[in-house]
Amino acid sequence: MGNERLKAPEGPPSDVERIKEESNYLRGTLKESMLEPISAGISDDDNRLMKHHGSYLQDDRDLRNERQKQKLEPAYQFMLRVRMPGGVATPEQWLVMDELAQKYGNGTMKLTTRETFQLHGILKWNMKKTIQAIHSALLDTIAACGDVNRNVMCTSNPYQSEIHQEVYEWSKKLSDDLLPRTRAYHEIWLDEEKVAGTPEAEEVEPMYGPLYLPRKFKIGIAVPPSNDIDVFSQDLGFIAIVEDDKLVGFNVAIGGGMGMTHGDKATYPQLAKVIGFCKPEQIYDVAEKIITIQRDYGNRSVRKNARFKYTVDRLGLETVKNELENRLGWSLDEAKPYHFDHNGDRYGWVKGVKGRWHFTLFVEGGRVTDYADYKLMTGLREIAKIHTGDIRLTSNQNLIIANVTSQKKKKINELIEQYGLTDGKHYTALRRSSIACVALPTCGLAMAEAERYLPKLIDKIDEIIEENGLKNEEITIRMTGCPNGCARHALGEIGFIGKAPGKYNMYLGAAFDGSRLSKMYRENIGEEEILKELREILPRYAKERKEGEHFGDFVIRAGIIKETTDGTNFHD
């Protein structure tokens, strides 16, 4: 019975499928486009392919109208995203990214919600030099975007360094194992000579095939009790199971994803469901087989319904699990107990194993730059020059100066104090629990501000927070400029999605540990209405909450918002 349901949706393939099919394994005419001297942009077809190489063509939307008036083409520039599984960089790699941001980018770095770097403002003529410099630092941008498996995340956990290190190694191997096999990236950016002859498709891309996946695919590994990576937001999530201080394996969760489309109830955020347990060395097999199920049965006709979450919901969880076990040739074990208690970061100095220290730094909005009164970028540059451990980027857009020896701790602490780098302790816990996507001016999808606006909105919300004695109460707040959900808005206890300039849909009721989605509370409201609503709700929370009750749980218990029990009733 189950296998009768195993088929892809009917319908003509989307235009992106045509582009991939004609691209000769992601080559297209990218090489020629990048050499074309007249325009700073590239063709639409090549831009679709460019994602698989880790980049998006963008333009400065702040300048768009003025340039149109002057009959100039948009101020085209590229965003470049690094593939860095687990978010771990060496100090030397940090310094290379810093230098490239200054030399070819807009002078800043964005720390992303998938634990990696983004550089913005790179001109077409500088792209190849930038990618080659990244390659020289033993990093790359392969498959950082596009219809493939993206950057593999793992918990940035300074408390259990040995377990973290082991999980990081698995995430790194998994990322490497799931890379596209085409040599297009190496030929276009690294001047690798093309091998003569046309090999068969299964030789070029044995797992992905010539069309790759119907849509992007995201994997993350969480180490309880921290759900900092929001494991249930992933297409494929692994939950580390630790027994007697040893990693015994992973619970497997499938079918999560945050993106949706305004006004289309057939699109919705969804949480991954746990379907079983596997041993550590089995995660490659599980991941590969899940990806091939999505390759074979995902929606290639309608891209907004093409994510794996819709494949799982359409076919049914049991059907997908049965097909997975059929392809594996073995069955998953029963899922093991686990417990998450938060999805935020833990700030400040922490002592880990082997006498090593870790300092988690608060980076508002993940933007590393020098402000007039806060030399964040310079301070981190000076630390990287003397640091002998590593630097871990977190999925909440912060960073950890990790594996600091006791001898180095004093000097690094002096630099932290000299440059005023902060663990955020003088901010409200709400601000420390905030994340925002880039949005305007560079993201072409943004309908409203996010990163540039959320800190200003929090300034005003903080007044309500302080008045009600909630300064130290962690409440997750997230803002995205569009419904694609890069800042995982649907897992924020307070969430905002941009609807139009200055207007947002407001969401409430997600779980503090990332195990429940929010629900829309108010539609298309501006700052005045946002603050009015919070002036009513936050004082009630301060007065009426039970001991230890989180804000997302309170608004449901108090009847302020209806509970979302599954993504399929997100819009109800």
Curated annotation (Swiss-Prot):
One of its GO terms (cellular component) is sulfite reductase complex (NADPH). Belongs to the nitrite and sulfite reductase 4Fe-4S domain family. It comes from Halalkalibacterium halodurans (strain ATCC BAA-125 / DSM 18197 / FERM 7344 / JCM 9153 / C-125) (Bacillus halodurans). [4Fe-4S] cluster binds at residues 437, 443, 482, 486. Component of the sulfite reductase complex that catalyzes the 6-electron reduction of sulfite to sulfide. This is one of several activities required for the biosynthesis of L-cysteine from sulfate. One of its GO terms (molecular function) is 4 iron, 4 sulfur cluster binding. Its EC number is 1.8.1.2. It comes from the Bacteria. Pfam families: NIR_SIR, NIR_SIR_ferr. Keywords: 4Fe-4S, Amino-acid biosynthesis, Cysteine biosynthesis, Heme, Iron, Iron-sulfur, Metal-binding, NADP, Oxidoreductase. Binds 1 siroheme per subunit. Binds 1 [4Fe-4S] cluster per subunit. The gene is cysI. The keyword Signal does not apply. Pathway: Sulfur metabolism; hydrogen sulfide biosynthesis; hydrogen sulfide from sulfite (NADPH route): step 1/1. It catalyses: hydrogen sulfide + 3 NADP(+) + 3 H2O = sulfite + 3 NADPH + 4 H(+). GO terms for biological process: cysteine biosynthetic process; hydrogen sulfide biosynthetic process; sulfate assimilation. InterPro entries: CysI, NiRdtase/SiRdtase_haem-b_fer, Nit/Sulf_reduc_fer-like_dom_sf, NO2/SO3_Rdtase_4Fe4S_dom, NO2/SO3_Rdtase_4Fe4S_prot, NO2/SO3_Rdtase_4Fe4S_sf, NO2/SO3_Rdtase_FeS/sirohaem_BS. Alpha(8)-beta(8). The alpha component is a flavoprotein, the beta component is a hemoprotein. This is Sulfite reductase [NADPH] hemoprotein beta-component. Its cofactor is siroheme; [4Fe-4S] cluster. Siroheme binds at residue 486.
